[in-house]
Curated annotation (Swiss-Prot):
NCBIfam families: atpD. Keywords: ATP synthesis, ATP-binding, Cell inner membrane, Cell membrane, CF(1), Hydrogen ion transport, Ion transport, Membrane, Nucleotide-binding, Translocase, Transport. It comes from Xylella fastidiosa (strain 9a5c). It is found in: Cell inner membrane. This is ATP synthase subunit beta. SUPFAM superfamilies: C-terminal domain of alpha and beta subunits of F1 ATP synthase, N-terminal domain of alpha and beta subunits of F1 ATP synthase, P-loop containing nucleoside triphosphate hydrolases. One of its GO terms (molecular function) is proton-transporting ATP synthase activity, rotational mechanism. The gene is atpD. Produces ATP from ADP in the presence of a proton gradient across the membrane. The catalytic sites are hosted primarily by the beta subunits.
Length: 466
């Protein structure tokens, strides 16, 4: 048994001295005698001293306490025993529902699947949200990012996606709450409970009030649980299709920045850690699909000061298959979900994957919206009357498209009082195709606001004229 003693404590950073011939490896977990605190080795400083990060509060720690090397990285329980439970970064239950039953424990630091084991798919994942299904469709087994500044609706959009996909998708889900509000974690738990899908969801939380070590590692804990479901073969010899929700990936980066500063590394651009790209890559490369099973990942990405060129969101962009960008200017118009249809993109946007009709409709919608965007300056200076008849028609259609992108959400029913709407992809394509074809030029634009499919628009317009 390899034991050392604490020699220095600076906030969440603890230095431990071991015999020089028996220094623990980087990422090994150390247990401190008489406490529940786990330390993770981050650096070997020489002379037998290792610098570690504490996964938990260091209150009450003092010099010369004995730390024991476990000989392996942090391990967490995996398997069906985690479903329906809320756990912390170490896999301990925090929902007061008794101990977790498990048959296996996995280390949270793992290698990504090898190149030949990976598999890609072109199968689409229908979300029931019009603007997403039309403009930036999701792939099954793909990676999706929800980008947005503070208060534009990332978490509400994620909750709606969970509501629409996790309920329709019979597989398993893992939710990792990384550095977010505890209230949101609580809301999510009750939302899942009320909709009877709690027994298919494992929840791992490392919230805002926790030390940086917890927030940095909790995403890996959630990912490890998802990997187990993907890789563990059932009686048919296949793994499972898993949904992995991470809210919020920016807090993962931020925790890394805090840890990096505490470890004494020289900061890089905007104060981020110099290892930002590597840390992001280590996490993202593991979120992938294999021939055995798939992980479909939906990640919320906070955009500091609405600046998409900030190193953190910019580093995340390269790893994603679909990006859903939420815009403050669209939220200011009262259009929710506040997705920017011109700034959101998807690798699935190919006629061979989504079909000619969907592709052509999306292109025409984008052209109409882009034309309106280009004309906005002229309208602001000269007014609508100075536009040509063709331009007036384009503006009218674009405003209808903008409003038709809005949609009442199931998870927002309690706030808005309007019942949520799920719109199948075929209905979405049919509706937008009809608008750009000019079939509804005679209807008022207010009729397109906060409805489901195009039939509801006609119904609303008839009520308005009645």
């Amino acid at each position: 048994m390899n034991q050392g003693k604490i020699v220095q404590i600076i906030g969440a950073i603890v230095d431990v001295e071991f015999p020089r011939n028996n220094v623990p490896k980087v990422y090994n977990a150390l247990k401190i005698d008489g406490t529940a605190i786990i330390l993770e080795v981050q650096q070997q400083l020489g002379d037998g001293i290792v610098r570690t990060i504490a996964l938990g509060s260091t209150d009450g720690l003092k010099r010369n306490l004995i730390a024991t090397d476990t000989g392996h990285a942090i391990t967490v329980p995996v398997g069906t025993g985690t479903l329906g439970r809320i756990m912390d970064v170490l896999g301990n239950p925090i929902d007061e529902a008794g101990p977790i039953t498990y048959t296996d424990q996995w280390e949270i630091h793992r290698n990504a699947p090898s190149y030949e084991d990976q598999a890609s798919t072109t199968e689409l994942l229908e979300t029931g949200i019009k603007v997403i299904d039309l403009m930036c469709p999701f792939a099954k087994g793909g990676k999706v990012g929800l980008f947005g500044g503070a208060g534009v609706g990332k978490t509400v959009n994620m909750m709606e996606l969970i509501n629409n996909i996790a309920k329709a998708h019979s597989g398993l889900s893992v939710f990792a709450g990384v550095g977010e509000r505890t209230r949101e974690g609580n809301d999510f738990y009750h939302e899942m409970k009320d909709s009877n899908v709690l027994d298919k969801v494992a929840m791992v939380y490392g919230q805002m009030n926790e030390p940086p070590g917890n927030r940095l590692r909790v995403a890996l804990t959630g990912l490890t649980m998802a990997e187990y479901f993907r890789d563990e073969k059932d009686s048919s010899g296949k793994g499972k299709d898993v949904l992995l929700f991470i809210d919020n990936i920016y807090r993962y980066t931020l925790a890394g920045t805090e840890v990096s500063a505490l470890l004494g590394r020289m900061p890089s651009a905007v104060g981020y850690q110099p290892t930002l790209a590597e840390e992001m890559g280590v996490l993202q490369e593991r979120i992938t699909s294999t021939a055995n099973g798939s992980i479909t990942s939906i990640q919320a990405v906070y955009v500091p000061a609405d600046d998409l060129t900030d190193p953190s969101p910019a580093t995340t962009f390269g790893h994603l298959d679909s990006t859903v960008t939420l815009s403050r200017s669209i939220a200011a118009l009262g259009i929710y979900p506040a997705v920017d249809p011109l700034d959101s993109s998807s690798r699935q946007m190919d006629p061979l994957i989504i079909g000619e009709e969907h592709y052509n409709t999306t292109q025409r919608v984008q052209q109409t919206l882009q034309k309106y965007k280009d004309l906005k300056d002229i309208i602001a200076i000269l007014g609508m009357d100075e536009l040509s008849e063709d331009d007036k028609l384009a503006v009218s259609r674009a405003r209808k498209i903008e409003r038709f992108f809005s949609q009442p959400f199931h998870v927002a029913e309690v706030f808005t009082g309007a019942p949520g709407k799920y719109v199948p992809l075929k209905e979405t394509i049919r509706g937008f195709k009809a608008i750009v074809d000019g079939e509804y030029d005679h209807l008022p634009e207010q009729a397109f606001y906060m409805v489901g499919n195009i039939e509801e628009v006609i119904e609303k317009a008839n009520k308005m004229t009645a």
